[in-house]
Amino acid sequence: MSSCKDSLSLMAMWGSIARFDPKHERSFEGPEKRLEVIMRVVDGTHVSGLLAHDDDVWQKVIDAICAHIVSREFNEYIRSYVLSESSLFVMKDRVILITCGTITLLNCVPLICEAVSTVCGEVEWVSFMHKNYSFPWEQKGPHLSMAEEFKTLRSHFPSGQPFIFGPIDSDHYFLYFHSDVVQPSCSDDAQLSMTMYGLDRNQTKHWYSDKMLPTGPETAVIREATGLSEVVDDSWILHDLQYEPCGYSINAIRGSEYQTIHITPEEHCSFASYETNTCALNYSKCICGVLRVFDPERFSVIVFIDPDSAVGKSYHSGGTIGVEPEYYPNYEAHHRTVNEYTPGHWVLKVNYVKRAVGTVGTSAASGAKE
């Protein structure tokens, strides 16, 4: 509990789990930490980039955070790993590592940087992000507080900058990013992330098991029963895992695209996350599909808007991008954050709370542009 002396840690406790009861012996930290390292290709960089590394390299990265690889799927563009606590994606020019629970994600930064150096690449862009933790007092190492995370990240990337997106006393994201872009280039990456709380109990009952179930007929039944098969359809290569006694993860890849979903079903701390890099002019169809599966009491959606991406072009031309309140009449938008965190790169985050029965309608988001 020493971290509670840090005012930012105290603030981070507010709002994530609305009905937290300390009498619960087991409360799992669903909200993930996310680390992305993008490599600059220079003269002499291995033609396959980070894909030149075999699994031994990534196993060492995972060992550094005390997790392990459960399953893997590959295609020409992506190596996808389901981990004991979340996911790893490796592409030619980047690594994306997403971990839940009390995993000390920042401990693997030196090994990822070493992997970049080994193939004669250079670190061009780093981002570390997480939703405010549900149970921050249970975190370990550099994740005991935002101050410790900032200190650790600054030691690795001194020119990086920290941001908080959203109200500090409620649902918000902490982002630290480092940019060493030498010359402007086409910037068309896409990232849509959702965090959902208070999941539909008729759905969460499916994510309990008396044994761990890897991808197979039994997990196919779970996907069909819950509607996940509509989100991750047959066009995707998938691998999933039903945890024992509860919890579920799925990774899916299609060409250079990925989707990942992680579920904590316990009633007192039910949570699900969704992320994809799929390009779209408007994300409403994707978001609505995810909401149909989980029907959460509240959710946050965050979109990173690169200037040359499909969603970036739509946003800058004045079009809607699918996160606006008119798409979600069963929810009320409680706060919106818009931030140009580096020139030309914007982030848009909206917090939604389910409306009371009989009050369905359309509302404008409250909050401010930051």
Curated annotation (Swiss-Prot):
- Protein function: In association with the catalytically inactive AdoMetDC prozyme, catalyzes the decarboxylation of S-adenosyl-L-methionine which is essential for the biosynthesis of the polyamine spermidine. Required for growth and survival during the bloodstream life cycle stage.
* Binding partners and assembly: Forms a heterodimer with catalytically inactive AdoMetDC prozyme; heterodimerization is required to activate AdoMetDC.
Processing after translation: Is synthesized initially as an inactive proenzyme. Formation of the active enzyme involves a self-maturation process in which the active site pyruvoyl group is generated from an internal serine residue via an autocatalytic post-translational modification. Two non-identical subunits are generated from the proenzyme in this reaction, and the pyruvate is formed at the N-terminus of the alpha chain, which is derived from the carboxyl end of the proenzyme.
Cofactor binding note from Swiss-Prot or TrEMBL: Binds 1 pyruvoyl group covalently per subunit.
Residues holding substrate = F28, E85, E266
**What follows loss of this gene?**
RNAi-mediated knockdown causes cell growth arrest followed by death. Putrescine levels are increased and the production of spermidine, glutathionyl-spermidine and trypanothione is severely reduced. In addition, expression levels of AdoMetDC prozyme and ornithine carboxylase (ODC) are increased.
Could you tell me which pathway this protein works in? Amine and polyamine biosynthesis; S-adenosylmethioninamine biosynthesis; S-adenosylmethioninamine from S-adenosyl-L-methionine: step 1/1
The residues responsible for catalysis, as annotated, are: E29, E32, S86, C100, S249, H262
The organism is Trypanosoma brucei brucei
Which keywords does this chain's UniProt record carry?
Autocatalytic cleavage, Decarboxylase, Lyase, Polyamine biosynthesis, Pyruvate, S-adenosyl-L-methionine, Schiff base, Spermidine biosynthesis, Zymogen
Q: Which GO terms describe its molecular function?
A: adenosylmethionine decarboxylase activity; protein heterodimerization activity
Q: Which GO terms describe its cellular component?
A: catalytic complex; cytosol
Entry protein name: S-adenosylmethionine decarboxylase proenzyme
